[in-house]
Regions:
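Active-site phosphate-binding strand-loop segment of PLP-dependent enzymes
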Residues: 22-84
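Conserved active-site segment immediately N-terminal to the catalytic lysine
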Residues: 78-79, 86, 98-117, 136-140
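PLP-dependent aminotransferase class I/II
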Residues: 114, 120-184, 190-193
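Conserved PLP-binding catalytic core of the aspartate aminotransferase-like
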Residues: 174-186, 190-220, 230, 234-235, ...
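Active-site-proximal loop->helix
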Residues: 10-20
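Pyridoxal 5′-phosphate
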Residues: 27-31, 44-57, 87, 92-97, ...
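Conserved PLP-anchoring active-site segment centered on the Schiff-base-forming lysine
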Residues: 1-10
Length: 265
C-alpha cells in the first residue's frame, strides 16, 4: 500500500498508480488522518502489509513542509517505509544543501530520498538515494526506469558540476544570499517566511491571477499564474520562486508591483 499526501507532485501519484499497489491519500499535511489510515491498515492486515508513506520536503505549490519528525515517528510505530521527495529543498536546505531531512537530522530514517537536478543544480535528471538492496530491486524491476533512456554525457557532466557548486563554498554563499533574498521579500510584503524559495501569493480568482502575472511580465518579471487544474478551483496564485542571483533591486520592484495590485492581505 502507498499512502501519499494529497498535494504530492503528479509524478509521485502516477508512479504510485503504476506500481499496482493500493493507493490511499491523506489531506495535505494532516498527520492525524495519516495515522488513522496506518492504524486501520495494520489492524486489518495484522501488520503484514508493506506500507510506503510518501511526502515532500517542500511542497511545490504551497511552499510549506510537513512535520517530518512526526512522520518519522509514525513510520517507526507502524513499521512502514518512507519516501521523501526533496525536489524543492535539495540544494537550499540542510547541511551543504542535502534537503529538509538533513536539516532536521532525519536522513537516516528515510528509505528513499528523491532529488532533482533540474532546479538548484541547474541541469536535468534526478536521483533516488536508497540502500543497496532497494537500489538493486529498482534497477531490475522498475519498468519505467528500465525502459528510460540514460542521461546524455553532457547532461550528467552539467549535473555533476552543479552538485560540486552546491556542496562547496560557493554553494554556502549562494544559500546565504538566497536566505537574505527570501527575508527581504517577506519583510516588504509582510508575509510569513516560507520553508524554502517558493512563495505563493494567493489570489483566488483565475482571471485575476492571469492579469497580475501579465502585469509582472510587462515589467520584466516572469511569475506564472498557477490555477486549476494544477491547484483547486478558487485557489489561483502567483508562484514566486527566488534565487541567489536576484538583486535587492529586483526584489523591491517585484514587491512594489505586487503591493500595487492590493492582493497582499
Amino acid at each position: 500500500m502507498v499512502i501519499i499526501d494529497r498535494l504530492c507532485h503528479a509524478s509521485l501519484i502516477d508512479g504510485a498508480k503504476l506500481s499496482g499497489a493500493i493507493l490511499r491519500s491523506f489531506p495535505h499535511n494532516n498527520l492525524d488522518k495519516l495515522e488513522k489510515i496506518l492504524d486501520a491498515t495494520c489492524k486489518a492486515n495484522n501488520k503484514d502489509n508493506r506500507i510506503l508513506i510518501v511526502t515532500e520536503g517542500i511542497f511545490s505549490m504551497d511552499g510549506d513542509s510537513p512535520d517530518l519528525y512526526k512522520i518519522v515517528n509514525l513510520k517507526k510505530k507502524y513499521n512502514a517505509l518512507l519516501l521523501v521527495d526533496e525536489a524543492h529543498s535539495f540544494g537550499i536546505c540542510g547541511e551543504i544543501g542535502k534537503g529538509k531531512l538533513s536539516e532536521y537530522n532525519l536522513s537516516e530514517h528515510a528509505d528513499f530520498i528523491m532529488a532533482t537536478f533540474g532546479k538548484s543544480a541547474g541541469a536535468a535528471g534526478a536521483v533516488t538515494a536508497t540502500s543497496k538492496i532497494w537500489r538493486d530491486l529498482i534497477i531490475n524491476k522498475a519498468r519505467s526506469f528500465i525502459y528510460s533512456t540514460a542521461p546524455m554525457p553532457s547532461q550528467a557532466a552539467a549535473a555533476s558540476e552543479g552538485l560540486k557548486i552546491i556542496q562547496e563554498d560557493e554553494g554556502n554563499l549562494r544559500r546565504e544570499k538566497l536566505d537574505s533574498n527570501i527575508n527581504l521579500l517577506c519583510t516588504k510584503l509582510n508575509l510569513k517566511r516560507p520553508e524554502g524559495a517558493i512563495l505563493p501569493i494567493m489570489v483566488g480568482e483565475e482571471s485575476a491571477s492571469i492579469e497580475i502575472s501579465n502585469k509582472l511580465f510587462e515589467s520584466g518579471i516572469y511569475a506564472p499564474a498557477i490555477r486549476y487544474p494544477t491547484v483547486a478551483r478558487g485557489s489561483a496564485r502567483i508562484r514566486i520562486t527566488l534565487s541567489s542571483d536576484h538583486t535587492n533591486t529586483n526584489i523591491t520592484e517585484l514587491a512594489d508591483i505586487l503591493l500595487s495590485q492590493k492582493i497582499i492581505k
